Structure formats: structure tokens, C-alpha cells
Amino acid sequence: MALSLVLGLALSALVIGIRPQVAVPFGLSVLGSALLGSLLLPVLRRWKAGQVIREEGPQSHHKKAGTPTMGGLSFLPVGLLVAGIGSGWDPQWLAVALLTLAYTVVGWLDDWLVIRQRSNKGLSAKSKLLLQVGIGLVFCGYLAWQGIPTVLTLPGIGALPLGWLFWPLALFVLVGTNNAVNLADGMDGLAAGMVALVLAGLGLTAADPVLALVAFALSGTCLGFLVHNHHRARLFMGDTGSLGLGGALAGLALLGDQLWALAWMGAVLVAEALSVILQVGYFQYTKRKTGQGKRLLRMSPLHHHLELGGWSEVQVVGCFYGLTALLVGLGWAWWHWAGA
């Protein structure tokens, strides 16, 4: 709870001090998300929408079995609604909202299958990837129709023309960010807190005031969710929340020409995803070479490696919050110094 409180106070001070015009939407999102979570919790308990824990996961997580999931339903609609009202239903808001909701539906379907089957197997990996790619292709089509510049901008350095290579990169960012947030959602408060910070960073460095408003509204709604998701969590966001948040992050970065900010400020999320890729790749490589698969980490993603090394959940979450906050601060300083 202390970590969530510190994070909330820090982000509130940041908003009021640097972007006071979004303070009201930010605050409304925090309060609305916390309230809707309180209303949704008993409903999810009645529906017996409890999380199924992986057998191969850390033993300490098995006691979390049965904790209500699908918590994304309690905070994503709040942030999107507040941002929609605040922006006057601007087309930029609509694009982010539809992308977020599309990925939220994929996550909800996965959560629903897990609950229905009482196993940790929801959508197959292939089915989920196909849906993620399909939604990503539609969004890329929208970006092309809007005629956005196919460049990679770095503050203080300039714009790197990518031409047609921009589109594979955009699709990779959409699908990759989705999965990075999903993988980071493995400890109480971890994904929600880190994403709240990265969203705030995107809001601070956004040139478009509408995108800044959307980013801060969604950052606030993540903070409100932490009321129920901090250690020991009473509500999990599930894939419903993590895939939706991943879509929002990627959509904001692509629309706002902020891929640099997403990569830099979200580097801990990137590390979480890379840890899984490296773990799987190294295991398969050593198994093919020696007949015996070996692991680089005790367990992936990275947060489980640290946990099995003796770190408590609170220590891991606090460390990842601190690293993300540092990256956001340095990213904002870089952007500010460059005069962007």
C-alpha cells in the first residue's frame, strides 16, 4: 500500500506542477476507477471469476488462486470515458479508444475461457497472436489513411525516414507492447504501476494536447486500480486489462510520434519481454545442441527470476517502479533539453 501511495502522490504532484490542465481528468480517473473497482469486486466474486494460477509458477503465488480477475473492466472504461468527455470526443481519442477496446476484448475472451475451463489455458497462443496481429494491421491501415509521417523521431537528433519499414515496426510495436504488459502482470501492482508511470511520461512529452489528456486519464485510472491491486491484491487486471493497456501505450506512441519515449520510458517492460524471449530461445538452442535444455534465468519473466532469488514481491515492485520513474524523468529531461 505504501508503494502505491507514494506513486500516487508523486504522479499527482507531477501533473499539478507540469500539466495542470489535465489535473481534473487525472483526478476523476483515479476516483472513478477506485469506485468502479469497489462495485465490480462483489460482482466478480458472485460470478466466481477467480484467477487460475500456473502450476509451474512460484509456489508463493499459489495462494492467490481464486482472486477475482478481469479487473480491466473496472478501470479502462473510466479512463477512456473521462478522456472522451475532456477531449470533446476528438478523433485522436476515438482512435486510441477503439484500439484499446479491441485489445481489451481479446483479453476478456482469454480470461473468460480460463475461468470457464478452470485452467490457465485460455486462447491458444496462435489464436491470440492472430487476433493481436489482425487488430494491429487494421490500426496500421488507419495510420496510413491518416497519412502520418513514416519517420522515427529522436529529440535533439532529428527524424529518421523509414519509408515502408515503418509499417513492420509499427505492427511490431503494437503486438510487442501488448505482450510486454501482459508478461509484466505477474505481481501485485507491478504492471499497473509501471504503466501508470509510462503513460504519464507519454503525457508529459506529447505535442498533441488531446493525446496528453488521454495518456494522463489512463495513467490516473491505473492509479485508481492500484487501490485494489496493491500487495496483497484483491483484484487482478487479467488479460482484459493488460492487453488493453498495451494497446493504449502503443497507440498513443504511434499517433504522437513518440516511439522513442515508449522504448526509453518503458525499458523495464521491454526487459520483461526480452527475458522471456531469451529464456525460451536459449532453452531450445541448448536442447537442440546437447539434448538437455538449459535456462538463463531461474524463471521468466525477469520479476520471477528475482523473486526466486530471494526478493520479496514488494522489493521487486519497488525496484521496477523506481527504475521506471527514473527512466521517465530522464526521458522528460531529454525531451525538455532538446526543446521539443
Curated annotation (Swiss-Prot):
<feature type="transmembrane region" description="Helical">
    <location>
        <begin position="156"/>
        <end position="176"/>
    </location>
</feature>
<dbReference type="InterPro" id="IPR018480">
    <property type="entry name" value="PNAcMuramoyl-5peptid_Trfase_CS"/>
</dbReference>
<dbReference type="Pfam" id="PF10555">
    <property type="entry name" value="MraY_sig1"/>
</dbReference>
<comment type="similarity">
    <text>Belongs to the glycosyltransferase 4 family. MraY subfamily.</text>
</comment>
<feature type="transmembrane region" description="Helical">
    <location>
        <begin position="69"/>
        <end position="89"/>
    </location>
</feature>
<keyword id="KW-0460">Magnesium</keyword>
<keyword id="KW-0808">Transferase</keyword>
<keyword id="KW-0133">Cell shape</keyword>
<dbReference type="Pfam" id="PF00953">
    <property type="entry name" value="Glycos_transf_4"/>
</dbReference>
<feature type="transmembrane region" description="Helical">
    <location>
        <begin position="196"/>
        <end position="216"/>
    </location>
</feature>
<keyword id="KW-0472">Membrane</keyword>
<keyword id="KW-0131">Cell cycle</keyword>
<dbReference type="GO" id="GO:0046872">
    <property type="term" value="F:metal ion binding"/>
</dbReference>
<feature type="transmembrane region" description="Helical">
    <location>
        <begin position="235"/>
        <end position="255"/>
    </location>
</feature>
<dbReference type="GO" id="GO:0009252">
    <property type="term" value="P:peptidoglycan biosynthetic process"/>
</dbReference>
<feature type="transmembrane region" description="Helical">
    <location>
        <begin position="260"/>
        <end position="280"/>
    </location>
</feature>
<dbReference type="GO" id="GO:0005886">
    <property type="term" value="C:plasma membrane"/>
</dbReference>
<dbReference type="InterPro" id="IPR000715">
    <property type="entry name" value="Glycosyl_transferase_4"/>
</dbReference>
<dbReference type="GO" id="GO:0071555">
    <property type="term" value="P:cell wall organization"/>
</dbReference>
<keyword id="KW-0812">Transmembrane</keyword>
<feature type="transmembrane region" description="Helical">
    <location>
        <begin position="316"/>
        <end position="336"/>
    </location>
</feature>
<keyword id="KW-0479">Metal-binding</keyword>
<keyword id="KW-1133">Transmembrane helix</keyword>
<feature type="transmembrane region" description="Helical">
    <location>
        <begin position="129"/>
        <end position="149"/>
    </location>
</feature>
<dbReference type="InterPro" id="IPR003524">
    <property type="entry name" value="PNAcMuramoyl-5peptid_Trfase"/>
</dbReference>
<keyword id="KW-0997">Cell inner membrane</keyword>
<feature type="transmembrane region" description="Helical">
    <location>
        <begin position="24"/>
        <end position="44"/>
    </location>
</feature>
<dbReference type="GO" id="GO:0008360">
    <property type="term" value="P:regulation of cell shape"/>
</dbReference>
<keyword id="KW-1003">Cell membrane</keyword>
<dbReference type="GO" id="GO:0008963">
    <property type="term" value="F:phospho-N-acetylmuramoyl-pentapeptide-transferase activity"/>
</dbReference>
<comment type="pathway">
    <text>Cell wall biogenesis; peptidoglycan biosynthesis.</text>
</comment>
<protein>
    <recommendedName>
        <fullName>Phospho-N-acetylmuramoyl-pentapeptide-transferase</fullName>
        <ecNumber>2.7.8.13</ecNumber>
    </recommendedName>
</protein>
<keyword id="KW-0961">Cell wall biogenesis/degradation</keyword>
<dbReference type="GO" id="GO:0051992">
    <property type="term" value="F:UDP-N-acetylmuramoyl-L-alanyl-D-glutamyl-meso-2,6-diaminopimelyl-D-alanyl-D-alanine:undecaprenyl-phosphate transferase activity"/>
</dbReference>
<comment type="function">
    <text>Catalyzes the initial step of the lipid cycle reactions in the biosynthesis of the cell wall peptidoglycan: transfers peptidoglycan precursor phospho-MurNAc-pentapeptide from UDP-MurNAc-pentapeptide onto the lipid carrier undecaprenyl phosphate, yielding undecaprenyl-pyrophosphoryl-MurNAc-pentapeptide, known as lipid I.</text>
</comment>
<feature type="transmembrane region" description="Helical">
    <location>
        <begin position="95"/>
        <end position="115"/>
    </location>
</feature>
<dbReference type="GO" id="GO:0051301">
    <property type="term" value="P:cell division"/>
</dbReference>
<keyword id="KW-0132">Cell division</keyword>
<keyword id="KW-0573">Peptidoglycan synthesis</keyword>
